[in-house]
Amino acid sequence: MSNYFDKIAKVNYEGANSTNPFAFKHYNPNEVILGKTVEEHLRLAVCYWHTFCWTGNDMFGAGSLDRSWQKTGDLLVGAKQKAEIAFEFFQKLGVPYYSFHDVDIAPESNNFKEYLHNFNTIVDILEKKQSETGVKLLWGTANCFTNPRYMSGASTNPNPEVFAWAAAQVFTAMNATQRLGGENYVLWGGREGYETLLNTDLKREREQIGRFMQLVVEHKYKIGFQGTLLIEPKPQEPTKHQYDYDVATVYGFLKQFGLENEIKVNIEANHATLAGHTFQHEIATATSLGIFGSIDANRGDPQLGWDTDQFPNSVEENTLAMYEILKAGGFTTGGFNFDAKIRRQSTDPYDLFHAHIGAMDVLALSLKRAAKMIEDQTLQKVVDNRYAGWDQELGQKILSGKASLEDLAKIVETQGLDPKPVSGQQEYLENLVNSYLYR
């Protein structure tokens, strides 16, 4: 095993009173909550791209991070070194999963044969490292947005040759995901949108991306992939307006192309912020529509209008998110993937550990708080009581289709219905949630 992070042997759980910065205070993977271990509930994954590919660059400055694998003259040699160091990190952190884009793990090329050679070379290494360490692939995906060929979109591109290139990448990445035992395959349309309607045919582009998703579903069945297909919603950035704006928009798209039973959503907290929603709202919408799949765990900055991809640090926000997930029965094939990056000034390699340790503790503590809310059922009882009328005769008659508008008008008139407003008790419920958060 690589020994890049030689100052750490293994991050362990030491409890809330520990002062060791390289120990978990709340994340105890073997602790049983609601019949499952914390590890089974959270299904944590480290992402390859932000953790091992980002150089620390931004729009106003060059890379600030010193990473040995990014300095090799031979990019494939660097990719091999990166894989070794990545699995050292996964093992020492103790996460069960990881995730990647195709070009995160292997050098890209404008020559497809060279792309395949590079990619397959690294997939061979990943397969071996998974076998050696027991670390599994939560999901794989293809980067169909960074290369200049995709500046006008991938599946939505006005040039069908670009569509074909994207299809070739997804074909390759899906096959690799299946080979590596990946439990999901993600589709994020980073360039599937537009900058201006002056040069855009919305109807045509929507039909193109719809056909692309149908091709992905067809290939899933052709190769016997048992995982879940996921679309990741985002309203904008890098395009002005993206077609997968939010969970509700994605559901409408899936319905249009008959894919609502084939594809679910991978929800990112920061993307919810950009869409003007809370993280909790997007999860609740997905579970209510039956398309909840997985989570990209991070946070945004409400004062900034871009995807900051910071590590989650709010127990309050994540307890409410976890509550919605637990109410829906928890994850099946999905999990919490840390789509988050350290800050540009966090140049010490061990800052990667601090970031992930803190985020894992936040999610574990949020799980415990949400589980207590589920066990007590106090909040749910208030909601059930609020809608109790719909379980009674009039409510059931309306929902079952046994009452027309005329019937309802007669009921109001003959029975003299005069419903009175009932308190929503928002302040009480907010206090109730705080009593779980800060006990």
From Swiss-Prot:
Xref: Gene3D superfamilies: Divalent-metal-dependent TIM barrel enzymes
A single GO BP: D-xylose metabolic process
Molecular function in Gene Ontology: magnesium ion binding; xylose isomerase activity
Entry protein name: Xylose isomerase
Family: Belongs to the xylose isomerase family.
InterPro entries reported in the protein's UniProt record: Xyl_isomerase-like_sf, Xylose_isom_bac, Xylose_isomerase
GO (cellular component) term, any one: cytoplasm
